[in-house]
Design a protein with these regions (language model features):
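ABC ATPase A-loop
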Residues: 52, 66, 70
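OB-fold and OB-like beta-barrel modules that bind single-stranded nucleic acids
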Residues: 71-77
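Acidic side chains
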Residues: 16-18, 60, 69
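Hydrophobic residues positioned within well-ordered beta-strands of beta-sheet architectures
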Residues: 6-10, 55-57, 73, 87, ...
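Hot-dog-fold acyl-thioester-processing enzymes
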Residues: 2-56, 110-132
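HotDog/MaoC-like acyl-thioester-processing domains
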Residues: 3, 61, 66-67, 78-132
C-alpha cells in the first residue's frame, strides 16, 4: 500500500444528520461511493470503471459523525481479482476514524449485463498506484 491513501473530502449536509444529531448510518455507503467515484477515474484515467457493480459492502462504525465534523474518506485497493476489485476505506471525522469499510466491485459489461475480466491496463495502473 502507498504511504498515504487517496483521500476525498466529504461535505456533511444538514439532511445527512438524523434526530440523534449524527450522520445516519445509511449515508456512510454514499460517502464510500463518493470516494470510489473520484478514485477510479483518477487512477484508471477512464470513467468506464464506474460501470462496476457493488457485490459486497461491510462497514464497522467506530464513532458518530456530526454536522460539525470535517469528514474525509481514505480509499485504497487491497486486491484485484479476475473480475473484482476489493477496496478498503477509513471514514475520518475531524481526524478520528469514524468507520472502516470494505467493498468488492465487480467489473461489469453494460451491453451483456455480465461480469467481465479486469482489463490488464486497469490492473497495472492500480498495482502501480497502490504499490501492490
Amino acid at each position: 500500500m502507498r504511504d498515504e491513501p487517496f483521500t476525498v473530502d466529504i461535505d456533511v449536509r444538514y439532511n445527512d444528520v438524523d434526530l440523534l444529531g449524527h450522520v445516519n448510518n445509511a449515508l456512510y455507503s454514499t460517502y464510500l461511493e463518493a470516494a470510489r467515484v473520484e478514485y477510479l477515474p483518477e487512477v484508471l484515467r477512464t470513467t468506464e470503471a464506474l460501470d462496476s457493480v457493488l457485490a459486497h459492502l461491510e462497514i464497522d462504525f467506530e464513532r458518530p459523525i456530526t454536522l460539525e465534523d470535517d469528514v474525509e474518506v481514505a480509499i485504497w485497493v487491497t486486491d484485484v481479482g479476475n473480475s473484482t476489485i476489493r477496496f478498503a476505506y477509513e471514514v475520518r471525522a475531524s481526524g478520528e476514524v469514524a468507520a472502516t469499510a470494505e467493498t468488492v466491485q465487480v467489473v461489469y459489461d453494460t451491453e451483456t449485463q455480465e461480469p467481465r475480466p479486469v482489463p490488464d491496463e486497469w490492473r497495472e495502473r492500480i498495482e502501480a498506484f497502490e504499490g501492490l
